[in-house]
């Protein structure tokens, strides 16, 4: 929690105003932010200086794991995060590759589970990672990438958190996640929860102990219409201790994650928080 607040304060103190062409808004921006999550100690990085909703974040990651390409599928498992980008983004609405309502195109999990090859085949990156790690193999390339510039035109949004690199040291699994851009007041808590949970899940289904998750952000920003709430409300509050995340121990394989797992298989305990803050969202 401390590192989140320190990043927010750093953006305010050191940030540069940048005009964002996609949203038409200015962002106060810094380059390079590093966050660390101690999954081994179960210090779940859920923001406590405002009420945060962790279930949608985990549901979204579950949708990525399953390779979903439709906002309706995400809604069905508890995440409404793709509704706007799939249905309210004018550039995507005008895109000939859009298949209809709720279609997201070839984004995120589609790339992770079915990266297109020049010969017409596809690569299931996540399956390869899980298979290797389950055998105790780390080939120094256990990398899950959603970033495919050759197909950006076929999706509603380029990936923000685009790469997850797993590393196995002995019987302990670590994760380094890379993010090109982050809306810190709104998006970062989602991303923190997802990085933490992804390491916890992959460690569990491959039979390893979860270690440390490293989260690297390139462009960290606060939109101009979010700044006042951040300065006058959230940064004035004192954080509470981190809560803990429990995952159903019956989840033992990638197939389990693909088929029967729901949000009922996750539980957060010890979550104390301040009142919610309604930050503006930029599509």
Swiss-Prot record:
Predominant subcellular localization, coarse grouping: cytoplasm
Pathway: Pyrimidine metabolism; dTTP biosynthesis
GO molecular function annotations of the record: thymidylate synthase activity
Alphabetical list of Pfam families matching this protein: Thymidylat_synt
UniProt-annotated catalytic positions: 160 (nucleophile)
GO biological process terms on file: dTMP biosynthetic process; dTTP biosynthetic process; methylation
Presence of keyword Metal-binding: no
Gene3D superfamilies: Thymidylate synthase/dCMP hydroxymethylase domain
EC number: 2.1.1.45
Location(s) in or outside the cell: Cytoplasm
Membrane-spanning residues: none
CDD domains in alphabetical order: TS_Pyrimidine_HMase
Domain of life: Bacteria
Catalytic activity: dUMP + (6R)-5,10-methylene-5,6,7,8-tetrahydrofolate = 7,8-dihydrofolate + dTMP
Keyword Transmembrane: no
Coiled-coil blocks: none
Residues where (6R)-5,10-methylene-5,6,7,8-tetrahydrofolate binds: 183, 282
The entry's keywords: Cytoplasm, Methyltransferase, Nucleotide biosynthesis, Transferase
Binding site for dUMP: 22, 180-183, 191, 221-223
Listed GO CC annotations: cytosol
Subunit record text: Homodimer.
Function: Catalyzes the reductive methylation of 2'-deoxyuridine-5'-monophosphate (dUMP) to 2'-deoxythymidine-5'-monophosphate (dTMP) while utilizing 5,10-methylenetetrahydrofolate (mTHF) as the methyl donor and reductant in the reaction, yielding dihydrofolate (DHF) as a by-product. This enzymatic reaction provides an intracellular de novo source of dTMP, an essential precursor for DNA biosynthesis.
Family of this protein: Belongs to the thymidylate synthase family. Bacterial-type ThyA subfamily.
Protein's name according to its UniProt entry: Thymidylate synthase
């Amino acid at each position: 929690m401390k590192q989140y607040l320190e990043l927010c304060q750093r953006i305010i103190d050191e940030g540069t105003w940048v005009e964002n062409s996609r949203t038409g808004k200015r962002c106060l921006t810094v380059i390079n932010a590093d966050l660390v999550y101690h999954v081994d100690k179960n210090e779940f990085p859920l923001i406590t200086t405002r009420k945060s909703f962790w279930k949608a974040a985990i549901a979204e990651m579950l949708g990525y794991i399953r390779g979903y390409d439709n906002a309706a599928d995400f809604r069905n498992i508890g995440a409404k995060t793709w509704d706007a980008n799939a249905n309210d983004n004018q550039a995507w609405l005008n895109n000939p590759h859009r298949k209809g309502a709720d279609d997201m195109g070839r984004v995120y999990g589609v790339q992770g589970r079915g990266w297109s090859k020049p010969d017409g085949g596809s690569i299931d990156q996540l399956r390869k990672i899980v298979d290797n790690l389950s055998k105790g193999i780390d080939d120094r390339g256990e990398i899950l990438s959603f970033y495919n510039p050759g197909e950006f035109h076929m999706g509603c949004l380029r990936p923000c958190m685009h790469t997850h690199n797993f590393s196995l040291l002995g019987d302990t699994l670590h994760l380094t996640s890379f993010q090109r851009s982050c809306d810190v007041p709104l998006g970062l808590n989602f991303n923190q929860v997802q990085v933490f949970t992804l390491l916890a899940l992959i460690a569990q289904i491959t039979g390893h102990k979860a270690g440390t998750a490293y989260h690297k952000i390139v462009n960290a920003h606060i939109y101009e219409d979010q700044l006042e709430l951040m300065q006058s409300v959230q940064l004035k509050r004192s954080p509470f201790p981190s809560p803990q995340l429990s995952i159903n121990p019956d989840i033992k394989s990638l197939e389990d994650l693909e088929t029967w797992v729901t949000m009922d298989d996750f539980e957060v305990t010890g979550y104390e928080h301040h009142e919610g803050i309604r930050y503006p969202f930029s599509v």
